[in-house]
Regions:
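Short loop/turn segments that connect beta-strands within beta-propeller blades
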Residues: 51-55, 89-93, 140-144
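A short beta-strand motif characteristic of beta-propeller blades
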Residues: 13-19, 55-61, 96-103, 145-151
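Beta-rich, blade/repeat-based domains predominating
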Residues: 20-34, 63-78, 104-120, 149-167
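A short loop-to-beta-strand structural motif that recurs across blades of beta-propeller domains
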Residues: 46-48, 84-86, 135-138
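Glycine/small-residue-rich loop that forms an oxyanion/phosphate-binding "nest" at active or ligand-binding sites
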Residues: 77-116, 127, 131
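Conserved beta-strand positions in repeat-built beta-propeller and related beta-rich domains
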Residues: 31-32, 37-42, 78-83, 123-131, ...
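Intrinsically disordered, low-complexity, positively charged segments
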Residues: 19-53
Length: 167
C-alpha cells in the first residue's frame, strides 16, 4: 500500500529564457493578446516584456519602484508605481495617471496587485522594511476610483481568484 497521496509529477528540465539580473523580480503575467510575458523589477524600477517567439526582451525604466503589471489592451498595460497606478503605452512608453495611491507620507509603497473578474485592480501597499500592519489593500475601478478594502495589512502578495471567481 502506498503512503503517498500525491499524484505523480513529471520533472522537466528548466531553461533560462532571459537573463534579467533583476534586483527584485516579481509579478510575472502572460499577456494573452500580445503572446508575451511581463514582469517587474521592483527595486530596479523596470517593467519587462519577453517575446518568446523572438527571444527578445523589451524594458521600460521608471523614476519610482514598479511593483505589479496587468494587461489592459494589445498596446497598454496597467502598472503600480510606488504611489500611483498608471497606464503604459507599450508603443512609446508614455504613461498616463489612472489613480494616486495614498503613500502615508512616503512610508509605504505599492506591492502586489491583480485585476478581479469585474475589472477592478486590487493592489496592496506595504511599509518600507515590511513593518507589521503598515499597509492597506485597495481596489481601483476602471474609472480610477480608489476604495480602501482592508487596513493594517503587512504585505499583500499573491493576489488571485479561484475558478469560481472568489477572492
Amino acid at each position: 500500500m502506498s503512503t503517498s497521496c500525491s499524484p505523480k509529477v513529471e520533472i522537466i528540465p528548466a531553461e533560462l529564457a532571459y537573463q534579467a539580473e533583476a534586483t527584485t523580480g516579481e509579478g510575472s503575467i502572460w499577456h494573452p493578446e500580445r503572446h508575451t510575458l511581463f514582469w517587474v523589477d521592483i527595486e530596479g524600477q523596470t517593467l519587462y516584456e519577453y517575446h518568446p517567439d523572438t527571444k527578445e526582451c523589451s524594458s521600460w525604466k521608471f523614476d519610482r519602484m514598479v511593483s505589479t503589471v496587468v494587461p489592459e489592451t494589445d498596446s497598454t498595460v496597467i502598472i503600480a508605481l510606488q504611489n500611483e497606478i498608471v497606464r503604459v503605452n507599450l508603443h512609446d512608453g508614455h504613461t498616463t495617471s489612472v489613480a494616486p495611491i495614498p503613500d502615508e507620507n512616503g512610508k509605504v509603497r505599492c506591492n502586489d496587485g491583480k485585476c478581479d473578474p469585474a475589472g477592478h485592480l486590487w493592489v496592496g501597499t506595504m511599509g518600507f522594511g515590511a513593518p507589521k500592519g503598515a499597509g492597506t489593500l485597495y481596489t481601483v475601478s476602471p474609472a480610477g476610483t480608489v476604495t480602501t478594502k482592508l487596513k493594517k495589512v503587512t504585505i499583500s502578495n499573491g493576489i488571485v481568484w479561484s475558478s469560481n471567481k472568489k477572492f
